Regions:
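N-proximal low-complexity "stem/linker" segments adjacent to membrane-targeting elements
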Residues: 1-27
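Acidic helix N-cap motif at the loop->helix transition within catalytic regions
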Residues: 16-19, 44-52, 75, 95, ...
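A conserved acidic beta->alpha catalytic loop
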Residues: 24, 39-48, 67, 91
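Conserved donor NDP-sugar-binding/catalytic core segment of glycosyltransferases
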Residues: 99-130
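The conserved acidic donor/metal-binding loop of glycosyltransferases
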Residues: 91-95, 119
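Short aromatic/hydrophobic "clamp" motif used to bind/position activated sugar donors
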Residues: 87
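Conserved nucleotide-sugar donor-binding catalytic segment
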Residues: 136-213
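Glycine-rich, basic loop-to-helix element that forms the pyrophosphate-binding segment
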Residues: 65-82, 103
Length: 213
């Protein structure tokens, strides 16, 4: 569907944070979206919380995995189920600013851009914003990304009508970086918005999270 954004969210034992994550999507000023949350066999109350949220907003749906597959495979399963031309990524313990999608989709459609990302803010485990903002450069090519892997997955939007279909590679780590390189290798540079539209939550190593998954 034209200009529909499919938001891909892997979830693993994120009961403490999933409400903030999903509510930040529901609060978006841009309303043409669907959110696909893949629960990767959580052992906490994540599924119950997601079910409650999906009952509030029909644009949210959950895919429950019976075995643990890891974040890359969870994202790939969601990609196969996604209906949108635009694909966005948001981990279950992160959250967006309300105008994130509106600003990013407008930017991409006006300039016919295939791959964009934004600056993002580091938050505490409780979600309090710090002064630490990871600033997005205006443009990143394949060669420059090899030297500076600055793209935050929680900020990325890709127009797959332009890039063609894609999946995350089945590797143990850095699968997002590998995918960005693949997209750039196809000839699509990544363009950055300097405003921070997303919030990256730092979780302690004692908590099980998709960031550590």
């Amino acid at each position: 569907m034209d200009n529909l954004v499919s938001i891909i969210t892997p979830c693993y034992n994120s009961e403490k944070y999933i409400d903030d994550c999903v509510n930040s999507v529901i609060a978006q000023s841009y309303n043409k979206w669907e959110m696909i949350i893949v629960d990767d066999c959580s052992s906490d109350a994540s599924v119950e919380k997601i079910m409650l949220l999906s009952n509030i907003d029909s644009r949210i749906r959950i895919i429950k995995l019976e075995e643990n597959h890891g974040a890359a495979e969870a994202r790939n399963i969601a990609l196969e189920d996604a209906n949108g031309s635009f694909i966005a990524f948001l981990d279950a313990d992160d959250f967006w600013e309300p105008i994130k999608l509106e600003c990013q989709i407008n930017y991409m459609t006006k300039k016919n851009i295939a791959f964009s990302f934004t600056s993002y803010t580091i938050t505490s485990q409780s979600g309090d914003k710090t002064k630490n903002v990871v600033r997005a450069p205006k443009e990143i090519s394949y060669n420059s990304y090899l030297k500076n892997t600055i793209i935050g997955c929680l900020t990325v939007v890709i127009n797959r009508k332009i890039t063609g279909s894609f999946q995350f590679p089945k590797i143990k780590s850095s699968h997002d970086m590998a995918l960005w390189l693949e997209i750039m290798k196809r000839g699509y540079n990544a363009y950055g918005l300097q405003t921070s539209y997303a919030n990256y939550r730092i979780v302690s190593t004692s908590n099980t999270s998709n960031k550590l998954h």
